[in-house]
A protein has these predicted regions:
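Intrinsically disordered, polar/acidic, low-complexity terminal segments
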Residues: 7-53, 64-117, 126, 130-167, ...
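Membrane-interface micro-motifs in multi-pass membrane enzymes
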Residues: 29-46, 91, 119, 162-206, ...
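Membrane-interface alpha helices of multi-pass inner-membrane proteins
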Residues: 212-240
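Perimembrane helix-loop-helix junctions
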Residues: 232-263
C-alpha cells in the first residue's frame, strides 16, 4: 500500500520525489492523530449528518440551504476547537512586527504596505486585537468562520434558488474546506474579508436604495485599502458599472470612489512615507501577458477550489477552467445571435460574480503566473467566487436546465465537500497538522528556562517559517522577547 501511494505521489508531483515518502508517513500519523482526537466522534457525526442530508435531499425543501449552512458552520467550529492554533505564522510576523519593536509610529505602520498589498484596514483589526484582546490569534480563526457563515446567509437571502439540490451546491462552495489554510493564518483573514466584501457588493451594486448605495460606496472605497483581492471591486466598477441599471449619478459616485480608493492605496504611502522602502515594480507585465504561463494560470486558477494542493494537477485545472470559459463564451455568443448587443448587456448585468472572478484571475495571472498559484489554497476564494457565478449562470439559463441532473449535482457537491475536508493540506488534515506544529512550539516555551530560550526560538523560527530564512531572525527573537516579557499572545502563561 505504501509503495502504491508513493508511486501516486511521485506521478502527481515529480519535482518533490524526495519528499513523497516523508509526506506519506506523515499523513498516516496525522490521520491516526485525528481519529484519536477528543472531538473526532462529534466531528464524524456532524459530517455524517451533512452527508445524509445531501444524499436524501429533495429538489424542493424549505430552509434546507440554511440548515446545511448551519451544520457546516458547526462542523468548522468543531474542527477549530479540536485542533486549536494560536500562533502567528509566516507573514503574520511581519504584519505584527511594529506592535512589538515599534520602529515607526502606529500611523506609519498602518499605511505601510505588505509586499504589493495595502492592508490598512486589516492592520486596524490587528491593532484592535493587540489593544483589547492581548493579540489573541485564535480569534482570527473563528472570525473567518463567522464571516463565511454570514456570506452564506447573504447568498441564501438574495438568491431565490427554487431547487434545493442546486442551492446546496452553492453552500458547499462557500464552505469549501480548502479555505482552512486561510482560516488558521491571521494575515489570510484578508482573503475572507474580501470574500465578504465581494458578496455584499454583488447584492447592493444594482440597488437604488440609499442604504445600499452607502454600503456599496464604502465597500468600493475600502476594498483596495484592505488587500490585493479587494482591487476587483473598483476595477469592476471602472469597467462594467455602465451595464448596471442604476441612476447615472450613482454610477459616477462609484467611479469616483473607485479611483480615490486605488489612488490612496497606491500613492499615499509613497507620497507621505517614501522612507519606508516602497519601490516601484520592475515587472514587465506586457511580457507576462504574452507568455503561455499567464494563460495556464488564468484558466487554471478559476478551478482552484476543485484541485488538490499538488502542482502535478495544475494542468487539469487549466483544462477545467478553459472548458468552463468556453461554455460561457458559447452561451454568450448564442444569446448575441438571438438578442444582439442586448444579450451581452444582460449577461454582464446579471453575472457580476463571473466578471469579478475573471478580474481576480487576470490580476493573479499577471502577478503570480505559475503552477503553484493554480493549486495553492490561498487562491481558493477567487475560484469560489467564479464557480458560484458560473453555476448560477447555468442554473438561470432555462434552455440548459437539463444540465441540472440531480445525481450529477449531488456528485459535484460530495466531491467539493470531501475534497475540501479530506485532501492533504485541506480541511481537517491542514488544521490537525497546524495544531501539532503549534503544540510542539508551545510545549517548548512552556518548559523553557533562560538557558534554552535560543533553542525554542530556533525551533519556532524553523517551524513557523517552514524552514525559510526570508524574515530576519534577530527581529523574530526580539518579538518573542517582547511577547514573553508582556505575557502576550500565545506566550501568555
Amino acid at each position: 500500500m505504501d509503495t502504491f501511494l508513493l508511486n501516486i505521489c511521485v506521478f502527481l508531483d515529480p519535482t518533490r520525489k524526495d519528499k513523497c515518502r516523508e509526506f506519506i508517513f506523515e499523513t498516516i500519523d496525522i490521520t491516526q492523530f485525528i481519529v484519536n482526537s477528543n472531538l473526532f466522534l462529534f466531528i464524524a457525526l456532524i459530517f455524517l449528518l451533512i452527508l445524509i442530508k445531501i444524499f436524501f435531499l429533495k429538489e424542493y425543501e424549505n430552509y434546507s440551504s440554511l440548515l446545511l449552512a448551519f451544520f457546516l458552520f458547526i462542523l468548522f467550529v468543531l474542527i477549530m476547537v479540536n485542533f486549536r492554533t494560536n500562533i502567528p505564522w509566516v507573514d503574520d510576523w511581519e504584519w505584527i512586527e511594529n506592535l512589538q519593536v515599534q520602529k515607526i509610529s502606529t500611523v506609519e505602520w498602518l499605511l505601510q504596505p505588505a509586499n504589493i498589498h495595502n492592508i490598512f484596514f486589516i492592520k486596524i483589526i490587528f491593532l484592535i486585537n493587540n489593544n483589547f484582546f492581548n493579540l489573541n490569534f485564535e480569534l482570527f480563526n473563528y472570525l473567518s468562520i463567522i464571516l463565511i457563515f454570514l456570506i452564506s446567509i447573504i447568498f441564501v437571502k438574495n438568491e431565490k434558488i427554487d431547487n434545493s439540490i442546486y442551492a446546496a451546491l452553492f453552500i458547499i462552495l462557500i464552505f469549501s474546506g480548502k479555505q482552512f489554510a486561510n482560516f488558521s493564518q491571521a494575515s489570510n483573514i484578508a482573503w475572507t474579508i474580501c470574500f465578504f466584501y465581494i458578496i455584499s457588493f454583488k447584492y447592493t451594486v444594482s440597488s437604488n436604495k440609499v442604504s445600499s448605495i452607502i454600503l456599496c460606496s464604502i465597500l468600493i472605497f475600502i476594498s483596495p485599502l484592505t488587500f490585493g483581492l479587494g482591487y476587483v471591486l473598483p476595477l469592476y466598477v471602472l469597467t462594467f458599472i455602465y451595464f448596471q441599471e442604476i441612476n447615472y449619478k450613482i454610477k459616477i459616485n462609484y467611479m469616483i470612489l473607485s479611483i480615490a480608493g486605488i489612488l490612496l492605496a497606491q500613492m499615499l504611502p509613497r507620497i507621505f512615507f517614501d522612507d519606508l522602502g516602497i519601490s516601484g515594480s520592475n515587472t514587465n507585465y506586457l511580457n507576462i501577458l504574452f507568455h503561455y504561463s499567464f494563460y495556464l494560470t488564468f484558466f487554471g486558477v478559476l478551478s482552484n477550489v476543485f484541485l488538490p494542493w499538488i502542482e502535478g494537477v495544475a494542468y487539469v485545472g487549466t483544462i477545467i477552467g478553459f472548458i468552463q470559459f468556453l461554455l460561457i463564451f458559447y452561451l454568450i455568443l448564442k444569446n448575441y445571435n438571438q438578442q444582439s448587443f442586448f444579450g451581452i448587456h444582460i449577461f454582464i448585468k446579471n453575472n457580476t460574480l463571473i466578471i469579478l472572478g475573471l478580474i481576480f484571475a487576470f490580476i493573479v495571472s499577471l502577478t503570480r503566473p505559475d503552477l503553484q498559484t493554480i493549486v495553492a489554497a490561498r487562491y481558493s476564494v477567487g475560484s469560489i467566487i467564479f464557480q458560484i457565478g458560473f453555476w448560477l449562470y447555468l442554473y438561470k439559463e432555462n434552455q440548459y436546465r437539463y444540465l441540472i441532473n440531480v445525481n450529477f449535482i449531488k456528485l459535484v457537491i460530495i466531491y467539493i465537500l470531501t475534497s475540501g475536508l479530506f485532501f492533504p493540506y485541506h480541511g481537517i488534515h491542514w488544521q490537525a497538522k497546524r495544531h501539532l506544529s503549534n503544540n510542539k512550539v508551545l510545549e517548548c516555551y512552556k518548559n523553557d528556562t533562560k538557558t534554552v530560550t535560543n533553542r525554542c526560538n530556533k525551533l519556532a523560527y524553523n517551524t513557523l517559517f517552514y524552514g525559510g530564512k526570508w524574515y530576519e531572525i534577530e527581529l523574530f527573537n526580539e518579538q518573542i522577547r517582547v511577547l514573553k516579557d508582556k505575557n502576550k499572545s500565545f506566550l501568555n502563561f
